[in-house]
A protein has these predicted regions:
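N-terminal, active-site-proximal structural segment of metallo-dependent hydrolase catalytic domains
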Residues: 2-163
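Soluble catalytic domains of enzymes that build or remodel membrane lipids, polysaccharides, and related
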Residues: 118, 131-142, 153-335
Length: 335
């Protein structure tokens, strides 16, 4: 009798222990689900309200915006973890960042509209002052058969190589400082554009403006190379770039020609608020990511093509050259 009672007591104790263990595991799974859901909501907040992230400390907002599309990978990682945890809470919460990312960047994946009768093709490329293969670089650029080619970091003797290699297809050209423009159409009104920040004291010429005489009317073309940014322990160092972008924006705003095309290494992505003086005044590509830097493993597009009174079609990267940037090409539909 005593033996039976002891067995019954042990059995009940085992049942209570197993129940407590199952309850503990359930709580742990639910807790992990809420943690994943919290990260999902945070990611959605960064995507939708990235402009609210302050720039006062280390330009944190600009740093986030430079890599904003890559938050899509965070969404994918959270989705995998939520599926492994079988957390309905996390999966539901992930709808928020998924919708946010799609609204911001989903359109870039859509196909390009058909070419119109008043289109131009333009190429933008920072050829790098350390480029050891200017001949091969010129070959890649010429193969795009663009109407305009904008180049930055032009230094002798490489500049002469580009001039000679591109001359057969591009008889019109201008080089101002370290930036240049090659064109199939005549150029007029060529002049440098002063976009030098006040803190730079040495000789520094990185902007030009020219009027392109196309069969469809005159177009003001701007070529620019904004100062580089650096990521330090204190954050993103971009004050010179931001100042230069402001000067370039003022020049574009004062341009008398109705139609304007801007091509340049702007050392900034389009989402970065540092380019607001330009993106607020000009149209940008709505199709294509075209990450252009670094060429070995592109993670951001800092080479930009913009237009006023014209539409920028799909932007795409060309084959790698001897530069640390990839060339980008886009079709411009004139209005």
């Amino acid at each position: 009798m005593k033996t039976s009672v002891l067995r019954w007591v042990r059995y009940r104790a085992g049942q209570r222990g197993a129940g407590a263990e199952r309850e503990g595991k359930g709580r742990s799974v639910r807790a992990r689900g809420w943690v994943l859901a919290s990260f999902a909501v945070l990611t959605a907040g960064l995507l939708v309200f990235h402009r609210a992230v302050p720039n006062s400390v280390g330009r944190t907002g600009s740093l986030l915006e430079s890599f904003l599309p890559w938050l899509g990978l965070v969404v994918v990682a959270l989705l995998v973890l939520a599926a492994l945890r079988r957390s309905v809470t996390a999966l539901v919460a992930l709808v928020l960042p998924a919708v946010g990312w799609t609204c911001l960047f989903g359109g870039l994946l859509l196909p390009e509209a058909e070419a119109g009768p008043y289109d131009m093709v333009v190429v933008q490329h920072n050829v790098s002052d350390a480029n050891r293969d200017p001949v091969g670089t010129a070959r890649v650029l010429a193969a795009a058969d663009a109407d305009l080619i904008a180049l930055q970091e032009l230094v002798p003797p490489a500049t002469a190589v580009y001039e000679e290699a591109l001359a057969p297809r591009y008889p019109y050209r201008t080089v101002q400082g370290t930036v240049g423009l090659w064109s199939k159409h005549p150029l007029a009104g060529v002049r440098p554009v002063d976009i030098k920040p006040r803190g730079i004291t040495e000789d520094w010429s990185r902007g030009l403006r020219a009027v392109v005489r196309t069969p469809h009317g005159d177009i003001a073309a701007y070529v620019a190379h904004l100062p580089s940014v650096r990521v330090r322990a204190a954050g993103l160092m971009s004050s010179w770039r931001d100042e230069s972008a402001g000067l370039l924006g003022e020049a574009v705003a004062a341009e008398e020609q109705t139609r304007v095309i801007l091509m340049g290494d702007l050392n900034s992505t389009l989402d970065d608020r540092g380019l607001a003086p330009l993106t607020s005044r000009m149209n940008v590509a709505k199709r294509g990511f075209a990450f252009s830097f670094p060429a070995s493993f592109p993670v951001a597009r800092i080479d930009q093509i913009m237009a006023r009174s014209a539409t920028v079609g799909r932007i795409r990267a060309l084959s790698r050259t001897g530069s640390d940037h990839l060339p980008v090409v886009a079709r411009i539909t004139l209005r």
